[in-house]
């Protein structure tokens, strides 16, 4: 059924398409079942309305038509926008054979789109008895009607009507109109013949074969032609209505929505389109206005075009009506509040009013334009005593003398007998007729006692008919050129019941002789439509008073206009050329060039001026300026009328001065007294409030945030001992030192950051801010602050990390690092950053250089110089400026200075990339200013050669443009923990299983141990939470059998002069408290009994439970069963897993043809490193195991000084202006105090200021 709905016979081949050129549109009527105002002219009214009409824009109402009426003028109608009503008519047929669609935008009785009512012969019963064929509607003959979009059908009281019950109305109704009511009366007084045999299923509109109903909604399969049975091309387009001639939307017989130049569309083309290239709105040359169901290039006359592309009769809210010079009308948005307008009947608050009465007439006082209509009914002049409405008087009608335009209609069926015309509307120029009386009339006058019309200024009737009916004394109807007033061919004058021209001639009613073409609105010279000669005011005259007569005039076209009163009348020439005083030929009194004046100005202030002007007339009558131009107190004048010179008396000046001084003193004393009293009152009020106040001054506004109870330890300078300089920079110096707390016999290795002398307050504030941030941190993966020393130069005391920064560590040991080392570090850094996210701290400077190595298995995040704590209601931090590491931070941080935890995720991805490339420089060779453009174009760091796609995809996710698409740190912890359990699956390092088994001690570590003062030290964390030693821990005595086994480090020298750390079993350690950190202060790497470089012996293996639950560690980065923020609980009763990753056990590699792997360079080596392949563009590394040139990183600079005998080792990269990057031996490099060489951190090429455009 769905396919057949628009197939087969739905393709009507013989009918016109909706795009037929020259479509004639007419307005319908809205009289319902009311009797026509003029039955004599009713048929003429219908003919004028629908002659040649194809689309009825309103309702098609055919009522009260006589039996002999010729209705052939209806045969062109194809579409009705509203409803169709055929009622109380005696015609046998209505020729609407071409009507295709009834849209039902208005419905009869709010329900019916088609109503056929009481079309019968009044003498139906009599004619039947006498044998005469009765009149009345016999057949509908709507053979082309295939669509009713909205509304039902009502057919009643048609005794002669046949075939209405044979129509398949379900097929006529649109799919969404299937529930429309159908009320059909089949009671008839005659027998109806059957439908023609050609009509399938006996569906027809009449007896003729041409009247068979065309089915477009339900079609029997047998009715479909065999050659085109149910083909998709046999279906109409979805925008078609009433059938089609082909499958395209240009083949529709009628359009479902809008007809655009013969093509059916869902919407008309918009007037404005958006240009995506220039980001601006552009006029659409193909744009169309919506007019009914059509798309038109311009709105029809009398309709208003809107900005949204519609043709309307009333402007929308906050819009005003504007008429252009070419006569087009449009709605224009008011720049401010719209000016007040006068509403007539049918609009706004007068929507329910029927007529103009004494209760509402004053609303039209002073109105030049009325939006709406005017109607004068008998009740207007009779009043309504029950409602307290008095009768309308002739004097009250004078309010309409200023009226010039009516947008609706003017209907008058009652008028005062004392008024012989409609001269109260003498200035009315336009009746637009956008709303018509009964849907037909813009001007209707009936039953009046007036003698003539008197509408002398009326020049336009925009729409509708003119009805002048049954006015028994009205003349001059035929002397008005009505055709010049009409604006469309469907307009006409309908008159009846008025005096004839002969009767008016007998009354001596004729136009004034000077009226052009004999056209007038009444008798006399003021009622001419146009004048044959000249017009003076409202009168037609034969000539103007140019040379004679008073007042003198000048000619402007056909108008006689008076000269200015100050012009001297001339006899032989024109008195003036215009109506202004400067257009006179001569002046009768004086001339104040160029104006003629009655007298010269004396003390007159010109417009927009406060200075008076004094002039006197000379002998020729010309006004000359006075020598003295007095501005005030101009009393004494000379004989010419000019101000006389006056000398001011000194007494006046003295008096004025004295009075002014006294007044100033009095005011000063009064003001002083008032100020003193005011202060006393304020002081008194304040004391009273303080004595009586029982509540807090400020209201409580709790934020809900937890208090920061971190402790800040203040150290005395006597507790600190500086051993040697580790590095220097613009901020000051970093020392290796020892902290010896007062009263305790312990030595704690520390790093002391000392600001240099004369440091700016900003530097002091920044180091205190850094101390504030570090003091509140308590994670094993974040560097701890031990305290501050508030001397003249602030000193920051932190943990001393024996292995230096992670960047130097991976570069120095790139040939001896394994996959588990790298992945364990990734896990620990992610856990540290996850902790920072939990405490709402944005780091802003995460990089491998800012991660310190406490032990080869334990790293910590440091450098909180750029970190920012977020408040409880903050989710991001916006930087005001400063330097940032462009190549490490996220794109939104570069462009918008926006820093969040997700921007730290970006930096984490770059840090992982540094580890996986063994310390390569990101985006090497690319200037920092080009980084934003490069990132916006989608370029990212390349995949490191040792990384599998799994690891690289995590990096790529960290570098997503949308920060919300990046993973969270807790997700990164989970991902890298999973990879750390099976490291060689995710990080592939060649010959990893053959790598050296020597411990990963660094040159920096050896330099620390060479100092004699570094023995017998206690680790800072062990001092704060006691546990094993720092460099040379002693075995814990008295260890229980259920405690963890611990390690003891021993220091030996290898044959090559390298320092090796061995881990020997030291027995069992005592049980820890639940708050005590695990080995390495919470290291995530299991450090069982297998030490670095030690051989696993049988004695190191303790008995274990061989159950499946304990044979494998769930998390190889943390084999202990419970973790609480980096700390572990005792395992007194839980056996440890049997299989875990052992990152430190590597077999000795065999000798290769090229020889064994090169050892770490000794401290005194002076030979250059062999040149290696430097990283290419964007950090691509050709040889992952050779980074000889990567050590000379511009981020790290060495203080000037030192001797040639002890050059700076190339293996080290001490950081500049950072307390965690060390110099190998700066104490031996003499440098003048407070002098620095090199580039400070602020000038680091990896950091770029946010306040500089990038």
Curated annotation (Swiss-Prot):
Cross-referenced Pfam families: Furin-like, GF_recep_IV, PK_Tyr_Ser-Thr, Recep_L_domain, TM_ErbB1
Compartments, record wording: Cell membrane; Cell projection, Ruffle membrane; Early endosome; Cytoplasm, Perinuclear region
Residues recorded with modification Phosphotyrosine: 877, 1112, 1139, 1196, 1247
Membrane-side (Cytoplasmic) residue stretches: 676-1254
Modified residues (Phosphothreonine): 1166
Post-translational modification: Autophosphorylated. Autophosphorylation occurs in trans, i.e. one subunit of the dimeric receptor phosphorylates tyrosine residues on the other subunit. Ligand-binding increases phosphorylation on tyrosine residues. Signaling via SEMA4C promotes phosphorylation at Tyr-1247. Dephosphorylated by PTPN12.
Signal peptide stretch: 1-22
Organism, scientific name: Mesocricetus auratus (Golden hamster)
This protein's encoding gene: ERBB2
Alphabetical list of PANTHER family matching this protein: RECEPTOR TYROSINE-PROTEIN KINASE ERBB-2, TYROSINE-PROTEIN KINASE RECEPTOR
Effect of residue 659 to E: In oncogenic NEU
Effect noted on mutating residue 658 to E: In oncogenic NEU
MF terms in GO: ATP binding; RNA polymerase I core binding; transmembrane receptor protein tyrosine kinase activity
Residues modified as Phosphoserine: 1054, 1078, 1083, 1107
Disulfide bonds: 26-53, 162-192, 195-204, 199-212, 236-244, 240-252, 255-264, 268-295, 299-311, 315-331, 334-338, 342-367, 475-504, 511-520, 515-528, 531-540, 544-560, 563-576, 567-584, 587-596, 600-623, 626-634, 630-642
Annotated region described as Required for interaction with KPNB1 and EEA1, given as residue ranges: 676-689
Catalytic-site annotation from UniProt: 845
Protein name per UniProt: Receptor tyrosine-protein kinase erbB-2
Similarity comment text for this entry: Belongs to the protein kinase superfamily. Tyr protein kinase family. EGF receptor subfamily.
CDD domains, per the entry: FU, PTKc_HER2, TM_ErbB2
UniProt motif (Nuclear localization signal) ranges: 676-689
């Amino acid at each position: 059924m769905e396919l057949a709905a628009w197939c087969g016979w739905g393709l009507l081949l013989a009918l016109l398409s909706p795009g037929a050129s020259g479509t004639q549109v007419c307005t319908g009527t809205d009289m319902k079942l009311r009797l026509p105002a003029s039955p004599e002219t009713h048929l003429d009214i219908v003919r004028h309305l629908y002659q040649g009409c194809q689309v009825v824009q309103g309702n098609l109402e055919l009522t009260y038509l006589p039996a002999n009426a010729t209705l052939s003028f209806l045969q062109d109608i194809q579409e009705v926008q509203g409803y169709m009503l055929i009622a109380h008519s005696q015609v046998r047929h209505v020729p609407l054979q071409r009507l295709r669609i009834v849209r039902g935008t208005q419905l009869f009785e709010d329900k019916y789109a088609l109503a056929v009512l009481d079309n019968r012969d009044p003498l139906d019963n009599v004619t039947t008895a006498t044998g005469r064929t009765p009149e009345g509607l016999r057949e509908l003959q709507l053979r082309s009607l295939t669509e009713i979009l909205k509304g039902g059908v009502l057919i009643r009281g048609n005794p002669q009507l046949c075939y209405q019950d044979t129509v398949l109305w379900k097929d006529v109704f649109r799919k969404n109109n299937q529930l429309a009511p159908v009320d059909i009366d089949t009671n008839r007084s005659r027998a109806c013949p059957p439908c023609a045999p050609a009509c399938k299923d006996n569906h027809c509109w009449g007896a003729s074969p041409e009247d068979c109903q065309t089915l477009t909604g339900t079609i029997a399969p047998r009715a479909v032609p065999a050659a085109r049975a149910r083909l998709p091309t046999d279906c109409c387009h979805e925008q078609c209505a009433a059938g089609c001639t082909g499958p395209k939307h240009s083949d529709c017989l009628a359009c479902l929505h809008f007809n655009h130049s013969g093509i059916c569309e869902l919407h008309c083309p918009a007037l404005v389109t958006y240009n995506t290239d220039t980001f601006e709105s552009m006029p659409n040359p193909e744009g169309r206005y919506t007019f009914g169901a059509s798309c038109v290039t311009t709105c029809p006359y009398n309709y208003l075009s809107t900005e949204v592309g519609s043709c309307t009769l009333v402007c929308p809210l906050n819009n005003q009506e504007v008429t252009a010079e070419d006569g087009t009308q449009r709605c224009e948005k008011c720049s401010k509040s719209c000016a007040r307008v006068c509403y007539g009947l049918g609009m706004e608050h007068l929507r329910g009013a029927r007529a103009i009465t004494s209760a509402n007439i004053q609303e039209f006082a002073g109105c030049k334009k009325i939006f709406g209509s005017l109607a004068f009914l008998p009740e207007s002049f009779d009043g309504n005593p029950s409602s307290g409405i008095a009768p309308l008087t002739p004097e009250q009608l004078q309010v309409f003398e200023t009226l010039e335009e009516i947008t609706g209609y003017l209907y008058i069926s009652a008028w005062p007998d004392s008024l012989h015309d409609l001269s109260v509307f003498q200035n009315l120029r336009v009746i637009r007729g956008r709303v018509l009386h009964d849907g037909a009339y813009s001007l209707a006058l009936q039953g009046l006692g007036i003698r003539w019309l008197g509408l002398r200024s009326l020049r336009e009737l925009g729409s509708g008919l003119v009805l002048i009916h049954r006015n028994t004394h009205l003349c001059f109807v035929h002397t008005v050129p009505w055709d010049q007033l009409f604006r469309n061919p469907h307009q006409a004058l309908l008159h009846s019941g008025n005096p004839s021209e002969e009767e008016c001639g007998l009354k001596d009613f004729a136009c004034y002789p000077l009226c052009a073409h004999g056209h007038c609105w009444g008798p006399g010279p003021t009622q001419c439509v146009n004048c044959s000669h000249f017009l003076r005011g409202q009168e037609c005259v034969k000539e103007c008073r140019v040379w004679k007569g008073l007042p003198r005039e000048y000619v402007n076209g056909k108008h006689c206009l008076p000269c200015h009163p100050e012009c001297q009348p001339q006899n032989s020439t024109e008195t003036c050329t215009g109506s202004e005083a400067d257009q006179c030929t001569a002046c009768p009194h004086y001339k104040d060039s160029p104006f003629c004046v009655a007298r010269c100005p004396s003390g007159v202030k010109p417009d927009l001026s406060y200075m008076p002007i004094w002039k006197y007339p000379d002998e020729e009558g010309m006004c000359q300026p006075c020598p003295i131009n007095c501005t005030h107190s101009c009393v004494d004048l000379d004989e010419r009328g000019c101000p006389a010179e006056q000398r001011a008396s000194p007494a006046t000046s003295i008096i004025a001065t004295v009075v002014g001084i006294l007044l100033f003193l009095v005011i000063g004393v009064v003001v002083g007294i008032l100020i003193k009293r005011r202060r006393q009152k304020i002081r008194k009020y304040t004391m009273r409030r303080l004595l009586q106040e029982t509540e807090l001054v400020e209201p409580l506004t709790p934020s809900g945030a937890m208090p920061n109870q971190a402790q800040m330890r203040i150290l005395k300078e006597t507790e600190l001992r500086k051993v040697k300089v580790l590095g220097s920079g613009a901020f000051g110096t970093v020392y290796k030192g020892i902290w010896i707390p007062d009263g305790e016999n312990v030595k704690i290795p520390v790093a002391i950051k000392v600001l240099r002398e004369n440091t700016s307050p900003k530097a002091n504030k920044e180091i205190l801010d850094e101390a504030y941030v570090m003091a509140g941190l308590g994670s094993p993966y974040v560097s701890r602050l031990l305290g501050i020393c508030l001397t003249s130069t602030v000193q920051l005391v932190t943990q001393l990390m024996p292995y230096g920064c992670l960047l130097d560590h991976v570069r120095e040991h790139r040939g001896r690092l394994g996959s588990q080392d790298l992945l364990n570090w990734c896990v620990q850094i992610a856990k540290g950053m996850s902790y920072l996210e939990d405490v709402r701290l944005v780091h802003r400077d995460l990089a491998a250089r800012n991660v310190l190595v406490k032990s080869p298995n334990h790293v910590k995040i440091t450098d909180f110089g750029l970190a920012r704590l977020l408040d409880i209601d903050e989710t991001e931090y916006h930087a005001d400026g400063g330097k940032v590491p462009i190549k490490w931070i996220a794109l939104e941080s570069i462009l918008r200075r926006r820093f969040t935890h997700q921007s730290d995720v970006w930096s984490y991805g770059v840090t992982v990339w540094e580890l996986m490339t063994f310390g390569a420089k990101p985006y090497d060779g690319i200037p920092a200013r080009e980084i934003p453009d490069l990132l916006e174009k989608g370029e990212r760091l390349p995949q490191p050669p040792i990384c599998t796609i799994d690891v690289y995809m995590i990096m790529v996710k960290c570098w997503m443009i949308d920060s919300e698409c990046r993973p969270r740190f807790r997700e990164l912890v989970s991902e890298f923990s999973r990879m750390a359990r099976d490291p060689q699956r995710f990080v592939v390092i060649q010959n990893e299983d053959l790598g050296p088994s020597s411990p990963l001690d660094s040159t920096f570590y050896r330099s620390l141990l060479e100092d004699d003062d570094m023995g017998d030290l206690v680790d800072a964390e062990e001092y704060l939470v006691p546990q094993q030693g720092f460099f040379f821990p002693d075995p814990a005595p008295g260890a229980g059998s259920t405690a963890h086994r611990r390690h003891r480090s021993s220091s030996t020298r290898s044959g090559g002069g390298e320092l090796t750390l061995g881990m020997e079993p030291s027995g069992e350690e005592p049980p820890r408290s639940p708050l005590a950190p695990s080995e390495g202060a919470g290291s995530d790497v299991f450090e069982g009994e297998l030490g670095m470089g030690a051989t696993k012996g049988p004695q190191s293996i303790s008995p274990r439970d061989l159950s499946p639950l304990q044979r494998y560690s769930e998390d190889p980065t943390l084999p202990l069963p419970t973790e609480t923020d980096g700390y572990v609980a005792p395992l007194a009763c839980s056996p440890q897993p049997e299989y875990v990753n052992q990152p430190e056990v590597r077999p000795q590699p065999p000798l290769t043809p090229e020889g064994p792997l090169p050892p770490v360079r000794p401290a005194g080596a002076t030979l250059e490193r062999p040149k290696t392949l430097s990283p290419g563009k964007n950090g691509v590394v050709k040889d992952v195991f050779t980074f000889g040139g990567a050590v000379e990183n511009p981020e790290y600079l060495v203080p000037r000084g030192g001797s040639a005998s002890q050059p700076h080792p190339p293996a080290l990269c001490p950081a500049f202006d950072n307390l965690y990057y060390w110099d190998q031996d700066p104490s031996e490099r003499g440098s003048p105090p407070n002098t620095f060489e090199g580039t400070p951190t602020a000038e680091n090429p990896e950091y770029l200021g946010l306040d500089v455009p990038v």
